[in-house]
Amino acid sequence: MPFTLGQRWISDTESELGLGTVVAVDARTVTLLFPSTGENRLYARSDSPVTRVMFNPGDTITSHDGWQMQVEEVKEENGLLTYIGTRLDTEESGVALREVFLDSKLVFSKPQDRLFAGQIDRMDRFALRYRARKYSSEQFRMPYSGLRGQRTSLIPHQLNIAHDVGRRHAPRVLLADEVGLGKTIEAGMILHQQLLSGAAERVLIIVPETLQHQWLVEMLRRFNLRFALFDDERYAEAQHDAYNPFDTEQLVICSLDFARRSKQRLEHLCEAEWDLLVVDEAHHLVWSEDAPSREYQAIEQLAEHVPGVLLLTATPEQLGMESHFARLRLLDPNRFHDFAQFVEEQKNYRPVADAVAMLLAGNKLSNDELNMLGEMIGEQDIEPLLQAANSDSEDAQSARQELVSMLMDRHGTSRVLFRNTRNGVKGFPKRELHTIKLPLPTQYQTAIKVSGIMGARKSAEDRARDMLYPERIYQEFEGDNATWWNFDPRVEWLMGYLTSHRSQKVLVICAKAATALQLEQVLREREGIRAAVFHEGMSIIERDRAAAWFAEEDTGAQVLLCSEIGSEGRNFQFASHMVMFDLPFNPDLLEQRIGRLDRIGQAHDIQIHVPYLEKTAQSVLVRWYHEGLDAFEHTCPTGRTIYDSVYNDLINYLASPDQTEGFDDLIKNCREQHEALKAQLEQGRDRLLEIHSNGGEKAQALAESIEEQDDDTNLIAFAMNLFDIIGINQDDRGDNMIVLTPSDHMLVPDFPGLSEDGITITFDREVALAREDAQFITWEHPLIRNGLDLILSGDTGSSTISLLKNKALPVGTLLVELIYVVEAQAPKQLQLNRFLPPTPVRMLLDKNGNNLAAQVEFETFNRQLNAVNRHTGSKLVNAVQQDVHAILQLGEAQIEKSARALIDAARNEADEKLSAELSRLEALRAVNPNIRDDELTAIESNRQQVMESLDQAGWRLDALRLIVVTHQ
């Protein structure tokens, strides 16, 4: 290898040293100085791992003074190169730059530069890079992108709402599904889609204080969204880091009370430039035209500043039409400004609902009915569709569905309000109550008597709360170490029940963490019952482990003991037996408890066991819940309303459970009120809205498509390959679960999403739903997305060399495999990836420029190739450099046609889809005032920007592989 003083070389093994200069040569060794690091390296002349750096006409090079030059000619004299070309800063031509004056910090980023500089990657990295490009491009084009990554069951009505709302610009909607139908999941799905597509980057979630941790857990566990919880302490800390404390985080959860308590804090929230605001339990925002509540005004102020708003609420009609109007007014104050007008409009929707019912019934339509439909829809060319709907042809059903969609688009609040009911959604189990009346122990009787004397000045509410938990009254007098469990008959009953139902998974819920911990100790020590504990004092990871142990079929815990707060946000529908060791104070909490098991997807009827002590507040409450509200065996949408109306009477009965006079009348009145309200709700059901929210066959097809995608094995093969190359250890634990841990030889020292202790993953949705400690891996999971970013944002796998053993071709035949990427640069919120994600175009060229890619499929070809070590590869590249340059020029000439075809197709698709959406909404605007002006403006602006960005789309070489034919 001829070395000359002043020549520039690069190390094959330490490319981070930059450009080296030959500073000493003798008979056997050569010394290189690497100026960018100041280090020297001594190599053997005969076989040194270094590559000569030679640039070619067309390349851009940088001098050590920092100016750049486009090379036009290369001269060699006495082994040293001089580059002649035009300076890019002064446009001076004929400038000469000797190689000794090249910038030593030179980084080879183009694939061809890396290849010629000896920076040759392993063959498997090249294959991974191509697959990453291919799969990444395919995922963006999926119609349900953003809906597959969440750890949830594929429930059609939820997917329908999320698919519709998640793709809108700054959606402003009211999610009002009945309890247990998954409003939180729907909101999470919408957030996930908006964040993934770039439509939103900053999100604020405002919830009641008791639900903060539930939301935190749900967002992290189900959607891999890591929110920051802001309370007084966190807010004060963040004030040191930024003028506006909320600018320190992109995703924030806070309580409604926290938001409204301070004027300055509310101002900071309003100024924080959120893209989406989510408000849970929005039915608690009290409003009247004369006196809106402070809470309502706070949310109203925020809703004026935030483009997208999701309000989650209980049954809209539950608190009356005025309250319902108030929530719609938050979403669009221009549209919903007059309550009287709103009431009148609602009455006018009845004929539309009747028309939809008529179409769905499938009966022949009379001429009058056809005319009425034509008038309602108001489109000039509707006649053929009406005729098709009334025919006996195969198209009749789809024509009727299209007419239903058109009616729903044009009338009512279906664009801003989504509502599903249990009547309209199948798949819910029955609930069976088993009450167990137990005697009140003398120890408790004495403690209660003493407490009554000593606590005479306590309020009725405080006495009522005390009376619900006699074990705590006993401990107040006997001390925290008092062994109440030795005589409490509920403990004896629980042990007997568990030992006689060893094969059943049982969820036990009690109000306090201390009770759960004491019960675990008793069950373990007395009966050897395996019980996991779940309470608010545990970290999320500890709770995950407890939940996972409970979920294990054979060796897992038989019982999970949960505290009230600790169980928030967790669902255990693989269990169907529940024991309420005590009772919660209000019907909302009771429904929340039962909701841990009563979910869509529950395979068995739910058995609810309530052991209660006679002559205590528990005996009062169990009767009121069951006989007054029917709240154990059915969901109770009327519960809160009735609870508020009889609160004072109920508190008095709970505070003095021995005073039963008039209690039967109270229960009777509550039951009558419950039945009347329930009938009123049923009568007021908006069938039109339910049909729209449910999604019908379209939603079912969406769920089936995602289920099909779940079975795709490409992801598993790709992920394992990715983990291998990044350097992540994989340990198969069986049951479709794998443990990933960092190795000592990682591609990056700290891979995002992989902790030092490792993580458990699964590719199986069912396993992920049963095992909360296992992360559900999809194309949308941060682990895969971070892996794709790591590979594609750098130069991993961008240049390699392989040998093809093929005796049908002459030895030394060259092939060059080129991977071009066609892409457009644009702000993320334009969501350009819908039309033109970075798309790979593969070419396989011989020396004559023949493209063999169509005949030779990538994976088949890849299996026929053999790797070459870097040192040998560098020698081969140097030997054929001119030939490779010639083939690259042939590739550049050919790529334009393929790239232009992709760009034109993307332009046509974008123009067609965005123009159609704009035309549709403009037509609807004439008949449905729920189409917002700003939505139309945004779509028009988005269309223009998308088209401009696609006009500027281009292509670049992303990776190349040199293939040399051999017969050995």
UniProtKB/Swiss-Prot annotation:
A GO term, aspect molecular function: nucleic acid binding
Domain of life, source organism: Bacteria
UniProt binding sites for ATP: 177-184
GO biological process, one term: positive regulation of transcription by RNA polymerase II
The Helicase C-terminal domain, residue ranges: 490-662
SMART domains found in the cross-reference section: DEXDc, HELICc
EC number in record: 3.6.4.-
Keywords tagged on the record: Activator, ATP-binding, DNA-binding, Helicase, Hydrolase, Nucleotide-binding, Transcription, Transcription regulation
Residues annotated as domain Helicase ATP-binding: 164-334
GO CC annotations, alphabetized: cytoplasm
Keyword Transcription applies: yes
Sequence motif DEAH box, location on chain: 280-283
Subunit structure, as described in the record: Interacts with the RNAP. Has a higher affinity for the core RNAP than for the holoenzyme. Its ATPase activity is stimulated by binding to RNAP.
Function: Transcription regulator that activates transcription by stimulating RNA polymerase (RNAP) recycling in case of stress conditions such as supercoiled DNA or high salt concentrations. Probably acts by releasing the RNAP, when it is trapped or immobilized on tightly supercoiled DNA. Does not activate transcription on linear DNA. Probably not involved in DNA repair.
Family: Belongs to the SNF2/RAD54 helicase family. RapA subfamily.
Protein's recorded name: RNA polymerase-associated protein RapA
Source organism of this protein record: Escherichia coli (strain K12)
Lineage: Bacteria, Pseudomonadati, Pseudomonadota, Gammaproteobacteria, Enterobacterales
